[in-house]
C-alpha cells in the first residue's frame, strides 16, 4: 500500500480500485437523473416523499452478518467485503489458533472466520515521530537482563508498591507499602507461580520470594552483614529488624515476622545507615537526626521474644537527638528542613546528612558536628532561619522604597511612577524568590548520595547534575551526562551506576567519565543495589531487573543470540477484539435504545471497549472553569460527564460483564474504557492525558483526551479528538493533530497511585518540559510514537470539498460513496502526508455522519436549514499498529497486528446532529512469557561455555600483600599498615572491616568474637583510610590507631570508671582487609589481629595536666622498653632514656610533651603523672632513655632500627639468634650485634634497625627494650627519661606480627636466620 509508495497518489487510487473491483464484476447501476433541483424545492411535498430515505434503505449490521463471515447485501453490492492488499487479510482468524477458550475470543454471532475490511493507508509514515517503534525478542538498545520481577500491572500493586531494595550476599530485599520481601539468589532463575499460583496478582511471573507480615509502608532499607540483619525504616516512624537467614518449613506459607522494633521518629524514617562504629543513624522530617549506639541495640537484640516490649523500650530511650545537641540558646546550626538521606563515609568514619539545599558533616565516632555547607560547597554559618524570615525584610525594603518615592518630589508622570513601582516590586519579589530557592534552587536539590570506591562522595540533583566531593565536604567538580533528575546511585568496584527519573541507567568511572548508558525501564529508576554479579534496578512500577556487572560487553551479544534462537519457547500469541465508538453528542443526552444500537448490539464478543464523546458540555462558563481546573491539575471531570459514563456502563452490564478501567474529561471531550472481566488480568497500567487546542491551545472546546493501557504487555493508546471546525480550516485541523501527537504525555489516572507514593521525588521531573530543551530526541520521544498500537477517533471535522450541497446529497442517495471519498478532505490530506502520517482507515461504506437535524430519522435528516452544511464524514476512526510493511506477520518483531472487522455508523440514532460511529478491531498480540525466558536466561548463564569463560574472568583479583598480620597497640599508639598491589596492570579496591572484638582472658585458649553492627570498629580503634583504591605496583598506608575515649574526670585512682569491667582487660580485634579488582566479583581477604593491652595498674592521676607515664623522660619518641638505649627508633622500654619521644613511664623525665606518667615532671606539656619529667614528649614508661625511637627492649642499644632482642649486636640485618653477629639482616637474638636492621635480641646492639631487646643498645631504630636508651624515639619505660616524645610502656607496646625472642644461643640465632 502507500506505506511503501507513499508519494504516489495515483498508485494508491489504483490499489483501491483494484480492491473494489474484487467485490463484483458488475459495476453498480448509475442513476441518470439528479435530485439536486428536487432537494432545493421545499414546496412540493411529493418530492420530499420521493427523496425521503430511511434506515430501511440501509441494511443493519444484523442483516449483513452471516454465519460464515461478513458478506454484503445486494442493495449495496458496490461494497462487498474483499481481500485487502494489507496483511490484515492475509490470515483468516480462527478462534482456536490461540489456544485460549475465553469467551471474548469467540464470536458466536459472526463465526470463527471473518474477512477483514479493506483499508486506506496514509503517506508520510516510517520517518521521524511517525516511525513505527522497533520491537524484537530482546531490546536491542540495552543489555540482556535478569528479570527477577517482571513489570507488574500497577492496578495490582495498590497498597503493595515496592519502594526500595537492598542486597545481601545471597538475597535481595525489597521494601513495600505493606512490609518487606526477599528473593534468594539461588532461586532467581526459577519459574513463577503463574495465575493459578498462591501469590497475589502482579507476581505471577516473578521468581519465588518470601513476604513478611503486614507493616506500615517501608521507606528505607539497610543491610547489617555483621549481625545478619536487615534494618527497615517505615512511614509510621518505626525502625524494624529482620533476620537474613529466615528459613520457612516446607509447605509453610505464613509470612515471617519482625525482630526488634521501636518508635524512632514522629514522622516517616527517610534513611537508615550504620556508622563505622556500628551505631545506627536515622533521619526524618524537621531536620531530625537520631543515633542508637550499638551497645544499646546489642543488649535489646539479646533479649528473648517474650521480652520484646522491654527490648523496644530500652532502645527507644537510648536514642541520641543530634539536633538537640547542636542547639544552643535556641539557635541550631543545622537546618530544620527535611533530612532526605544519610551516607556513611566508612573511609573516614564520618556521616553525611543531605537536606534540601545543605549538607551537614558529622564525626561518626564522637558524634560531633564538623561542618555545614551548601550545594555549592560554601560553608553555612547560619542555617536554621525561620521560614520566610527573609521575605518580610524584602517586603519592608520594597515598602520603604515606595514610601520614600511618595515623600519625594514626583518629577515623572503617573505612568512612569507606576512603572517604576511595579518594577521595584518585581525586583524585590525576584530577590525573595532567589533567597528562598525558587525554581532554580529547586533544580539543584540533592536527591541521592553515594560513596565511591576511591573514597570520594558523589551527589545527584534534580537537574541531572553530578557533583564530586572529597571527604571533608569540599566540592571538586561536577558533570551532567543526562538532563533528567538523578534518583539513585550504586557503586561496584571502580564503577558508579546512576539511575534517572527517565528510566535511564548510566555508568561513569571514578573520574566522572561516561562509560555507557541505556534505557533500563519505561518508568523512573528509584533504587539500585549490587550483589551476585548483578546491578539490580527497581522501577517505579515495581519491576526489578538485574544487569550483569560485565555489561555492556561481549557477554550481551552471546546471551542475545542464544535467547533469540529460543524465541519460540517463550513467545506466546493471544488475540483480543477491541470496539471503539465516537459520538459528538451536541450537549444532549442519549436514550438507552440509542446506546444499545450504538454499542450494546456489537459488544458481545469484544474484550475492550473504548468510548469517546465530544461536546458533552460547551457553555462558555464551563469551558473557562475547565481551563482553570486544568491549569492546577484538576481532571476529575464534570457531573454530566459522569452521567454519560454511568449510563454507558449500565448499557454494557458493567457490574456483571465489564469493568470500568479509567476515564478522562477535558471540557467537552470525554473518553472512557471498559474491559471484560475475564480479560482483566492481562490489561492494566491505565494512564491518561489531555491536550487542549482551542483559543491559543488553552481551552478544551477543541483538543484531545487519551487513554494508554497495557494489553498482554503491549502498549495501546486511544485518543478522542475534536479538531478545528469549518470547511476552509484544513490547515488548522492538521496543526491540531500535529500538536496533539507531539505533546500528549500520559500520566497516572486519578484512581491510581501517584508517582511519589512509589518513591519518586515530587520535583519537576517531566522530560518534556520547556526547561529541558536541550534533551536529545531519543530521550524525548513522544509517548504516542512509542506505543504498539495507536487509535485516533472522534469528530475530526474534515469536510467534503469541491462539491455542492445538492451534489453531495445526490451521491449519498445513490450510495455512490466512492465518488464522495474522492472529495474527502481527510483522505486528500493523508495521501499528501500532511496528517495522520502512515496511519490506516477502513474504506468508508456508510453515509456521511454530519450534519443532521435532531430527531429526524433517515437520510432526509441532513441539514436543510439556512446554512445547508454539506454532508461530511466528520466522525472517523484511524489507527496504526506495529506493521512496517503489508507483508509483516505477527511476531515478537511485529507484536501487534490489527485488522478491522466492522466500521460503520448508527444512522438510526437521532439524539444529535452527528451520527455515532463504531469500529471493531481484531488484534493479534505476540508477547513474551517472562517466566520461561528467565529460565532460558539462567540456563545460558550456567551452561554456555563462552559465557562461563567471561564470568570466570570477573573472578580475577589483583595480588596484594599486607605488611603485617598482627598489631599490638597501647596508650594511643599508631601503627602504619601497608597494603601493596603487586599487579602491574589493574587497580585494586580495598575495604577494611572489623570481624569482631573479644576480651582476652588468661583462662581461655580461643577468643569469642563479637561483631558490631555492619562489621564496625570498636571505639578504641581508629582505622584510616578504611577503604580506597591502590594503583598498579603501588601501596597505600593505613593508620591503625588506638584511641582513648575518656577524660580526666572519668579516672579515679588511675582506673577509668565508666567502662564495663571487661574493658580493663586486654582486648583483641580482627581486621579483615577485603580486596577486589576494579570490576571483579570475587574478594580476597587478609586478616590482621590487633591487640589492645590495657595497663591500668600503672595509671595514676596527677595534678599536672600532662599524661606521662615515666619518671625520667627526654625527647623519647616511640614506645621504648629498655634500660639503656641511644638513638633507638622504635618502641623502647628502658630504665634510662634521653631525648626520647613517645610514651614514657619513668621516674625522671625532663621537658615531657605528651602523655607521661613519672614522679618528677618539669615544663611538661600534656597529661603527666611522674615525679620528675623534663621536656618529655609522649607517654614514656622507661627508667633511662636517650634519643630512643621505636620499641626497644634491650639493656644497651645504639643506632638500632627494628625489633631487636640481643645483648650485643652490630650491623646485623635479618633474623639472627647468636651471641656475635655482624652485618646481619633480619631478626637476631645475639649478645653482640652492631648495625642490626631487623628484629634482634642482644645485650649489645649498635645501629640496630628493628625491634631490639638488649642490655646495650645505641642508635637503635625500631622497637627496643634496654636498660640504657639514648635518643630513643617511640614509647619508652625507664626510670630516667629526658626529652621524651612518644608512647612507652614497661612491658609490651607495639608489635607488627612478630614476637620478641630473648635467647642468647647461637644455634637458635642460626635457625631463625635460616628461616628468613
UniProtKB/Swiss-Prot annotation:
This is Type I inositol polyphosphate 5-phosphatase 12. Residues 1287-1304 have a biased composition (Low complexity). It is an enzyme of class 3 (hydrolase). It catalyses: 1D-myo-inositol 1,4,5-trisphosphate + H2O = 1D-myo-inositol 1,4-bisphosphate + phosphate. Residues 788-804 are annotated as: Catalytic 1. The gene is IP5P12. Keywords: Hydrolase, Isopeptide bond, Magnesium, Metal-binding, Repeat, Ubl conjugation, WD repeat. Has phosphatase activity toward Ins(1,4,5)P3. Controls Ins(1,4,5)P3/Ca(2+) levels that is crucial for maintaining pollen dormancy and regulating early germination of pollen. PANTHER family: INOSITOL 5-PHOSPHATASE, TYPE I INOSITOL POLYPHOSPHATE 5-PHOSPHATASE 12. Residues 1114-1286, 1307-1316 have a biased composition (Basic and acidic residues). Mostly expressed in leaves and flowers and only weakly expressed in roots, stem and young seedlings. More precisely detected in cotyledon tips, hydathodes of leaves and mature pollen grains. InterPro entries: Beta-prop_IP5PC_F, Endo/exonu/phosph_ase_sf, Ig-like_IP5PC_F, IP5, IPPc, WD40/YVTN_repeat-like_dom_sf, WD40_repeat_dom_sf, WD40_rpt. Residues 761-772, 1101-1113 have a biased composition (Polar residues). Its cofactor is Mg(2+). Disruption phenotype: Precocious pollen germination within anthers. Hypersensitivity to abscisic acid (ABA) during seed germination. Elevated levels of Ins(1,4,5)P3 and cytosolic Ca(2+). Its EC number is 3.1.3.56. The keyword Cell division does not apply. GO terms for molecular function: inositol-1,4,5-trisphosphate 5-phosphatase activity; metal ion binding. There is a cross-link at residue 946 (Glycyl lysine isopeptide (Lys-Gly) (interchain with G-Cter in ubiquitin)). Induction: Not induced by stresses.
Amino acid at each position: 500500500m502507500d506505506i511503501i509508495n507513499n508519494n504516489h497518489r495515483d498508485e494508491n487510487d489504483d490499489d483501491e480500485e483494484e480492491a473494489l473491483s474484487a467485490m463484483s464484476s458488475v459495476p453498480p447501476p448509475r442513476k441518470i437523473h439528479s435530485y439536486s433541483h428536487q432537494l432545493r424545492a421545499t414546496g412540493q411535498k411529493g418530492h420530499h416523499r420521493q427523496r425521503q430515505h430511511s434506515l430501511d434503505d440501509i441494511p443493519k449490521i444484523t442483516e449483513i452478518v452471516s454465519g460464515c463471515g461478513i458478506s454484503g447485501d445486494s442493495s449495496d453490492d458496490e461494497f462487498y467485503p474483499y481481500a485487502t492488499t494489507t496483511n490484515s487479510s492475509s490470515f483468516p482468524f480462527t478462534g482456536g489458533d490461540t489456544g485460549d477458550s475465553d469467551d471474548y475470543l469467540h464470536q458466536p454471532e459472526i463465526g470463527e472466520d471473518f474477512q477483514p475490511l479493506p483499508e486506506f493507508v496514509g503517506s508520510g509514515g516510517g520517518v521521524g515521530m511517525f516511525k513505527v517503534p522497533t520491537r524484537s525478542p530482546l531490546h536491542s538498545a540495552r543489555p540482556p537482563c535478569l528479570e527477577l520481577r517482571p513489570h507488574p500491572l500497577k492496578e495490582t500493586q495498590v497498597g503493595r508498591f515496592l519502594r526500595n531494595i537492598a542486597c545481601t550476599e545471597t538475597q535481595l530485599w525489597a521494601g513495600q507499602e505493606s512490609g518487606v520481601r526477599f528473593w534468594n539468589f539461588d532461586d532467581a532463575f526459577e519459574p513463577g507461580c503463574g495465575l493459578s499460583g498462591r501469590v497475589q496478582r502482579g507476581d505471577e511471573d516473578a521468581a519465588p520470594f518470601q513476604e513478611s507480615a503486614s507493616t506500615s509502608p517501608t521507606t528505607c532499607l539497610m543491610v547489617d552483614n555483621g549481625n545478619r540483619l536487615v534494618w527497615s525504616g517505615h512511614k509510621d516512624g518505626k525502625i524494624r529488624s529482620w533476620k537474613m537467614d529466615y528459613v520457612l518449613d516446607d509447605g509453610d506459607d505464613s509470612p515471617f515476622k519482625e525482630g526488634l522494633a521501636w518508635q524512632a521518629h514522629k514522622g516517616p524514617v527517610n534513611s537508615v545507615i550504620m556508622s563505622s562504629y556500628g551505631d545506627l543513624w536515622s533521619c526524618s522530617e524537621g531536620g531530625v537526626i537520631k543515633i542508637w549506639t550499638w551497645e544499646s541495640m546489642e543488649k535489646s537484640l539479646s533479649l528473648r521474644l517474650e521480652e520484646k516490649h522491654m527490648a523496644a523500650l530500652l532502645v527507644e530511650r537510648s536514642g541520641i537527638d543530634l539536633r538537640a545537641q547542636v542547639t544552643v540558646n535556641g539557635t541550631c546550626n543545622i537546618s530544620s528542613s527535611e533530612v532526605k538521606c544519610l551516607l556513611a563515609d566508612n573511609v573516614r568514619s564520618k556521616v553525611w546528612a543531605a537536606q534540601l539545599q545543605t549538607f551537614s558533616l558529622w564525626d561518626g565516632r564522637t558524634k560531633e558536628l564538623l561542618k555545614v555547607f551548601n550545594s555549592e560547597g560554601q560553608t553555612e554559618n547560619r542555617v536554621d532561619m525561620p521560614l520566610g524570615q527573609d521575605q518580610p525584610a524584602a517586603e519592608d525594603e520594597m515598602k520603604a522604597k515606595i514610601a520614600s518615592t511618595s515623600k519625594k518630589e514626583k518629577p515623572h508622570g503617573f505612568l512612569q511612577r507606576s512603572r517604576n513601582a511595579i518594577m521595584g516590586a518585581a525586583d524585590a519579589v525576584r530577590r525573595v524568590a532567589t533567597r528562598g530557592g525558587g525554581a532554580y534552587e529547586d533544580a539543584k536539590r540533592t536527591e541521592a548520595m553515594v560513596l565511591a570506591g576511591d573514597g570520594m562522595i558523589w551527589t545527584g540533583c534534580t537537574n541531572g547534575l553530578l557533583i564530586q566531593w572529597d571527604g571533608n565536604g569540599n566540592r571538586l567538580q561536577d558533570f551532567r551526562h543526562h538532563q533528567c533528575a538523578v534518583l539513585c546511585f550504586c557503586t561496584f568496584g571502580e564503577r558508579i551506576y546512576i539511575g534517572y527519573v527517565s528510566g535511564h541507567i548510566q555508568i561513569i568511572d571514578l573520574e566522572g567519565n561516561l562509560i555507557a548508558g541505556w534505557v533500563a525501564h519505561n518508568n523512573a529508576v528509584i533504587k539500585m543495589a549490587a550483589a551476585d554479579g548483578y546491578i539490580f534496578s527497581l522501577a517505579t512500577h515495581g519491576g526489578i531487573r538485574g544487569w550483569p556487572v560485565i555489561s555492556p560487553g561481549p557477554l550481551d551479544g552471546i546471551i542475545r543470540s542464544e535467547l533469540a534462537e529460543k524465541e519460540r519457547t517463550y513467545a506466546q500469541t493471544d488475540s483480543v477484539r477491541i470496539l471503539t465508538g465516537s459520538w459528538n453528542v451536541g450537549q444532549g443526552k442519549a436514550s438507552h435504545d440509542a446506546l444499545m444500537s450504538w454499542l450494546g448490539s456489537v459488544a458481545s464478543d469484544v474484550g475492550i471497549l473504548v468510548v469517546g464523546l465530544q461536546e458533552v458540555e460547551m457553555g462558555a462558563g464551563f469551558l473557562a472553569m475547565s481551563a482553570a481546573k486544568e491549569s492546577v491539575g484538576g481532571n476529575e471531570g464534570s457531573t454530566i460527564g459522569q452521567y454519560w459514563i454511568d449510563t454507558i456502563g449500565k448499557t454494557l452490564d458493567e457490574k456483571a460483564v465489564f469493568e470500568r478501567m479509567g476515564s478522562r474529561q477535558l471540557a467537552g471531550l470525554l473518553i472512557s474504557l471498559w474491559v471484560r472481566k475475564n480479560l482483566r488480568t492481562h490489561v492494566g497500567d491505565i494512564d491518561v492525558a489531555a491536550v487542549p487546542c482551542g483559543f491559543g491551545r488553552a481551552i478544551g472546546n477543541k483538543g484531545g483526551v487519551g487513554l494508554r493501557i497495557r494489553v498482554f504487555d503491549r502498549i495501546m493508546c486511544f485518543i478522542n479528538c475534536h479538531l478545528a471546525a469549518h470547511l476552509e480550516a484544513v490547515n488548522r485541523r492538521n496543526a491540531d493533530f500535529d500538536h496533539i501527537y507531539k505533546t500528549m504525555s500520559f500520566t497516572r489516572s486519578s484512581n491510581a497511585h501517584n508517582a511519589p507514593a512509589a518513591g519518586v521525588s515530587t520535583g519537576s521531573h517531566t522530560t518534556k518540559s520547556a526547561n529541558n530543551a536541550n534533551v536529545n530526541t531519543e530521550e524525548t520521544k513522544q509517548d504516542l510514537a512509542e506505543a504498539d498500537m495507536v487509535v485516533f477517533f472522534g469528530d475530526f471535522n474534515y469536510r467534503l470539498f469541491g462539491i455542492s450541497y445538492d451534489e453531495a446529497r445526490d451521491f449519498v442517495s445513490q450510495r455512490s460513496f466512492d465518488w464522495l471519498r474522492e472529495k474527502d478532505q481527510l483522505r486528500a490530506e493523508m495521501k499528501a502526508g500532511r496528517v495522520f502520517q502512515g496511519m490506516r482507515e477502513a474504506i468508508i461504506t456508510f453515509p456521511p455522519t454530519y450534519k443532521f437535524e435532531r430527531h429526524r430519522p433517515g437520510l432526509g435528516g441532513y441539514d436543510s436549514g439556512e446554512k445547508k452544511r454539506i454532508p461530511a464524514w466528520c466522525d472517523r476512526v484511524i489507527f496504526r499498529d506495529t506493521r512496517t510493511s503489508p507483508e509483516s506477520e505477527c511476531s515478537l518483531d511485529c507484536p501487534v497486528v490489527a485488522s478491522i472487522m466492522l466500521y460503520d455508523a448508527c444512522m438510526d440514532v437521532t439524539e444529535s446532529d452527528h451520527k455515532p460511529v463504531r469500529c471493531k478491531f481484531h488484534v493479534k498480540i505476540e508477547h513474551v512469557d517472562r517466566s520461561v525466558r528467565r529460565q532460558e536466561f539462567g540456563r545460558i548463564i550456567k551452561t554456555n561455555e563462552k559465557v562461563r569463560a567471561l564470568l570466570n574472568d570477573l573472578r580475577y583479583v589483583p595480588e596484594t600483600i599486607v605488611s603485617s598480620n598482627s598489631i599490638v597497640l597501647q596508650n594511643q599508639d599508631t601503627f602504619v599498615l601497608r597494603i601493596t598491589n603487586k599487579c602491574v596492570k589493574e587497580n585494586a579496591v580495598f575495604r577494611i572491616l572489623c570481624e569482631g572484638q573479644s576480651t582476652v582472658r588468661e583462662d581461655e585458649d580461643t577468643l569469642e568474637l563479637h561483631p558490631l553492627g555492619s562489621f564496625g570498629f570498636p571505639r578504641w580503634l581508629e582505622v584510616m583510610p578504611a577503604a580506597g583504591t591502590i594503583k598498579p605496583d603501588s601501596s597505600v598506608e593505613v593508620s591503625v590507631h588506638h584511641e582513648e575515649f575518656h577524660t580526666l574526670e572519668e579516672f579515679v585512682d588511675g582506673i577509668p570508671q565508666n567502662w564495663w569491667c571487661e574493658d580493663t582487660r586486654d582486648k583483641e580485634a580482627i581486621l579483615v582487609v577485603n580486596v577486589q579488582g576494579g570490576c571483579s566479583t570475587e574478594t580476597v581477604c587478609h586478616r590482621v589481629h590487633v591487640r589492645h593491652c590495657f595497663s591500668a595498674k600503672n595509671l595514676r592521676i596527677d595534678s599536672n595536666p600532662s599524661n606521662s607515664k615515666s619518671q625520667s623522660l627526654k625527647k623519647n619518641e616511640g614506645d621504648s622498653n629498655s634500660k639503656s638505649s641511644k638513638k633507638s627508633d622504635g618502641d623502647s622500654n628502658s630504665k634510662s632514656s634521653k631525648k626520647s619521644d613517645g610514651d614514657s613511664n619513668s621516674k625522671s623525665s625532663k621537658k615531657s610533651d605528651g602523655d607521661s606518667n613519672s614522679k618528677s615532671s618539669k615544663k611538661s606539656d600534656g597529661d603527666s603523672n611522674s615525679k620528675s619529667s623534663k621536656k618529655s614528649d609522649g607517654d614514656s614508661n622507661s627508667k633511662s632513655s636517650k634519643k630512643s625511637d621505636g620499641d626497644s627492649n634491650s639493656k644497651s642499644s645504639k643506632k638500632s632500627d627494628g625489633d631487636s632482642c640481643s645483648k650485643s649486636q652490630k650491623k646485623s640485618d635479618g633474623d639472627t639468634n647468636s651471641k656475635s653477629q655482624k652485618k646481619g639482616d633480619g631478626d637476631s637474638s645475639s649478645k653482640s650485634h652492631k648495625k642490626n636492621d631487623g628484629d634482634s635480641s642482644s645485650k649489645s646492639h649498635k645501629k640496630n634497625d628493628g625491634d631490639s631487646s638488649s642490655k646495650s643498645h645505641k642508635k637503635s631504630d625500631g622497637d627496643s627494650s634496654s636498660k640504657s636508651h639514648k635518643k630513643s624515639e617511640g614509647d619508652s619505660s625507664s626510670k630516667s627519661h629526658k626529652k621524651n616524645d612518644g608512647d612507652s610502656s614497661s612491658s609490651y607496646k607495639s608489635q607488627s606480627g612478630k614476637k620478641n625472642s630473648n635467647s642468647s644461643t647461637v644455634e637458635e640465632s642460626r635457625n631463625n636466620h635460616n628461616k628468613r
